[in-house]
Amino acid sequence: MNRTYDIVIAGGGVIGASCAYQLSRRGNLRIAVVDDKRPGNATRASAGGLWAIGESVGLGCGVIFFRMMSSRNRREAQGAAVAVDASTPHILPPAFFDLALQSNALYPELHRELIERHGMDFKFERTGLKYVIQDDEDRQYAEHIVAQIPHLAEQVRWLDREELRRAEPAVSHAAHGALEFLCDHQVSPFRLADAYLEAARQNGVELLPGTNVTGVLRQGRRISGVRTDNAGVLHCRTLINAAGAWAAELSEMATGRRIPVKPVKGQIVLTERMPRLLNGCLTTSDCYMAQKDNGEILIGSTTEDKGFDVSNTFPEIAGLVQGAVRCVPELQQVNLKRTWAGLRPGSPDELPILGPVAEVEGYLNACGHFRTGILTSAITGVLLDRLVHEETLPLDIAPFLAARFQPEPAAVAVAAC
């Protein structure tokens, strides 16, 4: 069976779904979303944090990973302190701050639009994010963060011990205080992806679940379609690579070059439902916590280089639970509902890979978002829509182009139409 579309989007996670929705809003394109639903979709590894500043300065998964590496380095240095300075990893460059803040600003209107036009509610909540300071190294890390973002001083607030206790009564009284990010909020990650896809479907996008791209067709330098395992050949003029942790494989098929995207495993814990315990999202050097609208608390997340493995492991889950209980002692009496793992699409510099490549016309990247896919999904969809329509972009995407990696050509043959 052969079908013809203007655009094929490979990947139905939150990034591909956002692209599908934004591109479908004009009603002038025939679009298909191809998604294999392989285990480990990155949306599964997310707390749903819209932590525009928090993620940009390395909180959430970033500070957990930093403290893990810090502990290892300290052991190797036989107890010597680890410096927190300008070389500290995970504080992302200014270009990402711009991307993140612009994306964050889109969510209130996006939330209203998806509810009113499509009946889909992804549970946007204005919660703020607090980095709970539990020891001197946490404070040093927090001070370093503040020093890096003087231009965002109005969005950051120090809470002393008493102020933290008033804001979050459940937090351990041993905590020294917190650094609060006022514009960082949360959504339900699963409902966000579903909302994008359902709205896109209502706008006429064809969803092809359980379908995998097995080859890419080209006429000379131009994309002309894809081969799939279950839906035959899908002819198109534009292919968007939103394949998440599998994006490198699709890039190689489409361009002959393998972009440096690899899976980064994140394990997650979910509690039973309970009355409101947390007033906002919390992150520590051990874990992050977000209580959802149904009362469940999501606790995450590890950062592991384990290939495509999505199994849960006791030491890592126990570490998350212990970190959560250290911060919020009442959680010691709470039952765990389930655990799981997802695969974030990591890039070497932790920045997404967006936009065209010089070698192939009609191919666009929308991948490599690592731990910020939920946050940046809104702006990614807008950017891809404007790229397809050759319109002015709201920000410079040069820092996010695949060309920054200068990958070597792969020894593959690209199928001809």
UniProtKB/Swiss-Prot annotation:
The keyword Cell membrane applies. The keyword Transmembrane applies. It is found in: Cell membrane. One of its GO terms (molecular function) is glycine dehydrogenase (cyanide-forming) activity. Optimum pH is 8.3 (in the presence of Tris-HCl). Active from 7.3-7.8 in the presence of other buffers. Heterotrimer of HcnA, HcnB and HcnC. A lipid is attached at residue 19 (S-diacylglycerol cysteine). It is an enzyme of class 1 (oxidoreductase). A three-component membrane-bound flavoenzyme that catalyzes the formation of hydrogen cyanide, a secondary metabolite, by transfer of electrons to a cyanide-resistant branch of the aerobic respiratory chain. Induction: Reduced oxygen levels. This is Hydrogen cyanide synthase subunit HcnC. It comes from Pseudomonas aeruginosa (strain ATCC 15692 / DSM 22644 / CIP 104116 / JCM 14847 / LMG 12228 / 1C / PRS 101 / PAO1). GO terms for cellular component: cytoplasm; plasma membrane.
